[in-house]
């Protein structure tokens, strides 16, 4: 393991030198990539230092015990040895997880799209509940959220809502939320008290930079229209809303959240770029998932991933068989237990795949 960590230390020193070079700073793509790598391995370099200290403590304690000339020093050395031997396997496990190659997309900001599925008005209300859940979670993580586009439901919630999330390691945290979310509850409009099942689809798109995806504007049809509010009524008389259609793929992105037509066009282009990037990413994830029979990252955006059962106060994630009877807090944004479990399973899969390294 020390050999592998030595390589990490060499790479860290190399990057530390590179990111202060003027030619690197002037190359936006390279600088950003190196900066992300620097942040990613800094914690690992610190763990390496701790690992070296623990190994040195074991050697030192063994020497003192073997010498045996000072009884008091021997007792202290035995305590030091026990402490170091307890810490060593923990530290090795932590380092193994940190050595797992990170997806380069994990550090990216995201576009989250929530669409009401089967279930009519109730599905729209549920889409609104999911939107609230995610924005609350983002708040606790210190991330910023910004609505890009929305289409409100007739009885509340959203037929569709798209919002941007910016912060640290956003995609790496939220990527496993993509898929079909199902709710089982008695709708507000239900007079007979019957439980209905509705669904909403969540898409999590890593935000693509201009250098990730080149969009030829000759392939894009641009339409301008008036922004609309609830029920479709026009909320302004200027055509500030923008719809972009990517002709080769048929993908459509629009934005009407900003008052400025120029800003709406920029945001719509950002969504379009992210959707094109995600298409390629989904293919790659599907191939990777087949290789390692992944539980949590199938690349299948139509897979039912989670059920929210209100009568039982239960949330079940079907991919990892996790059931929590804490629906109230979860719907209020406390989804960290679910996120952590999904990340753990994904890391265990990667660790198994890369086990020959260790």
UniProtKB/Swiss-Prot annotation:
Keywords: Cytoplasm, Methylation, Protein biosynthesis
Similarity remark: Belongs to the prokaryotic/mitochondrial release factor family.
Function, as annotated: Peptide chain release factor 1 directs the termination of translation in response to the peptide chain termination codons UAG and UAA.
Residues bearing PTM N5-methylglutamine: 233
Matches recorded under InterPro entries: PCRF, Pep_chain_release_fac_I, Pep_chain_release_fac_I_sf, Prokaryotic/Mito_RF, RF-1
Record's protein name: Peptide chain release factor 1
Gene Ontology molecular function: translation release factor activity, codon specific
The record's account of how the chain is modified after translation: Methylated by PrmC. Methylation increases the termination efficiency of RF1.
A GO term from the CC aspect: cytoplasm
Compartments (UniProt record): Cytoplasm
SUPFAM superfamilies in the cross-refs: Release factor
Top-level taxon: Bacteria
HAMAP family (alphabetical): Rel_fac_1
Primary location group: cytoplasm
Lineage: Bacteria, Pseudomonadati, Bacteroidota, Flavobacteriia, Flavobacteriales
Organism the protein comes from: Flavobacterium johnsoniae (strain ATCC 17061 / DSM 2064 / JCM 8514 / BCRC 14874 / CCUG 350202 / NBRC 14942 / NCIMB 11054 / UW101) (Cytophaga johnsonae)
